[in-house]
């Protein structure tokens, strides 16, 4: 079955460790894509985000890795990824 409607999963909780300071960052990720016939369940989008966020990570790379993985796996018409995190390394240092 062909699908071409935008698919969005919003505000998925993510947890990571800052690769520079080894302290936690927590936040939310929202992922959207426009299918090119292929769709996956919403839980798969959350799993992809979780997989990348479990690594020592910076927020910018996490965002790019999730978007790139979806582009490679699903080959959609387009992908959008928004990550908003609170970084303990910034909170602790002021």
UniProtKB/Swiss-Prot annotation:
Disulfide bridges in this chain: none
Stored Pfam families: GTP_cyclohydroI
GO cellular component, one term: cytoplasm
Keyword set, alphabetical order: Allosteric enzyme, Folate biosynthesis, GTP-binding, Hydrolase, Metal-binding, Nucleotide-binding, Zinc
UniProt-listed GO biological process terms: folic acid biosynthetic process; tetrahydrobiopterin biosynthetic process; tetrahydrofolate biosynthetic process
Catalytic activity: GTP + H2O = 7,8-dihydroneopterin 3'-triphosphate + formate + H(+)
Protein name: GTP cyclohydrolase 1
SUPFAM superfamilies associated with the record: Tetrahydrobiopterin biosynthesis enzymes-like
GO molecular function: GTP binding; GTP cyclohydrolase I activity; zinc ion binding
Activity modulation comment: GTP shows a positive allosteric effect, and tetrahydrobiopterin inhibits the enzyme activity.
Top EC class for this record: hydrolase
E.C. code: 3.5.4.16
Binding site for Zn(2+): 18, 21, 89
Described purpose of this protein according to its UniProt entry: GTP cyclohydrolase 1 is the first enzyme in the biosynthetic pathway leading to folic acid.
InterPro entries assigned: GTP-CH-I_C/QueF, GTP_CycHdrlase_I, GTP_CycHdrlase_I_CS, GTP_CycHdrlase_I_dom
Family in the record: Belongs to the GTP cyclohydrolase I family.
Organism (species): Phycomyces blakesleeanus
Assembly description: Toroid-shaped homodecamer, composed of two pentamers of five dimers.
Pathway assigned to this chain's UniProt record: Cofactor biosynthesis; 7,8-dihydroneopterin triphosphate biosynthesis; 7,8-dihydroneopterin triphosphate from GTP: step 1/1
């Amino acid at each position: 079955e062909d699908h071409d409607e935008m698919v969005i999963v919003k505000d998925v909780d993510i947890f990571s460790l800052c690769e520079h300071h080894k302290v936690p960052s927590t936040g939310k990720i929202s992922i959207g894509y426009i299918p090119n016939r292929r769709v996956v369940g919403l839980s798969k989008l959350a799993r992809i985000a979780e997989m990348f966020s479990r690594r020592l990570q910076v927020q910018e790379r996490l965002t790019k890795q999730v978007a790139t993985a979806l582009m490679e796996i699903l080959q959609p018409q387009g992908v959008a990824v928004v990550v908003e995190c609170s970084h303990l390394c910034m909170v602790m240092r002021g």
